[in-house]
Structure formats: C-alpha cells, structure tokens
Amino acid sequence: KGIITMGSPLEKAACIRYQELLSPNIFNGYGTTESFWNTFLRPYDLPEMAGSAGRSCTDDEVRLVNVYDDRKAEPDDTVPCDNKTEGEIIIKCPNKTTYCYVNNEKATKDKFYKGWMYTGDIGTWNSEQFFTIAGRKDDMIISKGENIYPARIEEILNSHPKVQECIVTGVPDSTRGECVAAYVIKADESPVSYTHLRAH
C-alpha cells in the first residue's frame, strides 16, 4: 500500500505525520497537464527531501534553464545545480506529450521548443538533480527590481503553527512597483500579528 500526492510540494512536517499515521510509502509527484507527471519523490527520499519535487521519472528528461526577457533559453543553457540559482523547468517526454495544441499555433510556439516543453514553472535543482519549485514565471512579483516568487513565502508562512493556510500575491505600489501581500487564514482564534509572522 502507498500514497501518491500531487498538486503542491509535500512539506516535511506533513510528510512525517502522513508516514506515521497512514503509510511510510509516499510518492509526491510534479507534472503538467500536457505531460502528466515528470518528477517524483520516492519513499526512500523521504522525509529528508520533503519540500522538493523529487527527481525526473524514468522516461523523462527534466532540466532547469536560464530565463530571459526577450527569448527562450536553449535547452542546454542550464543554471548551476546549486539549489540556489533559479531557472525555468523544461521537460522532454516523447511518450507522454503531443508537443502541440490543436488549432493553436501561437500557444504551441510559446510552450514548445526544440522538442522540449517550457513549463513556465520556476525552481532550483541540486547536485543530485532534486528539483524544488519556487513559483510560476507569471506569478513573479517584481519589487524595486527584485524578483520574488510567492510560493517561497507561502511555504514559510504555512509552516507557522498559527497559520492554517495562506496565499501571497503582488499589489501595486507607487515606489516599489509591487509590494508583497499575504492573505492568511489562522489555524485557531488566538491572535497572531504581522510582526510575529514577519519574524518567523
């Protein structure tokens, strides 16, 4: 018996709880609508690598390439495997992807290049090629020239014991361009302040 989870990263505390209560055999996957799942955390990766999206599936190639404003990175224009430098996740999986959108040439051109699908997801990878999702290119907040990905902040806030769930977005700001706004659902009725959450 085992559990497969998808849709968002499996945070370490949740992983340990699920392993204790339900099953030690947990698989957490990352993928897209166009290409099914493409990376997996396997049971032997957990709980140490919880929070990451795992490594590529057997029949898939997954890379992290540089992001440019005016063009797509070439498939071999990868970022360092240092778990810090962010890039766009690209995927090659011929057995699962059609590499086109029917009757939509523009979307096909935007998404596919030289046999690779450019997901629009931003992440990092380490020397063992474990991927960690940082957010979406489209969701990026630019505040005084700094690129901020909401998913990073959401992960930190969601780890606070007084936070049940949160969502982070950018709001217009006259001096910064955008500021970060977090909408938080408290875990209980006890008070929690902005200062307290910021210190976390």
Q: What are these model-predicted stretches?
A:
Residues 55-59, 70-110, 148:
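Conserved ATP/PPi-binding loop(s) of AMP-dependent carboxylate-activating enzymes
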Residues 7, 31, 54, 121, ...:
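Active-site glycine-centered loops adjacent to acidic/histidine catalytic or metal-binding residues
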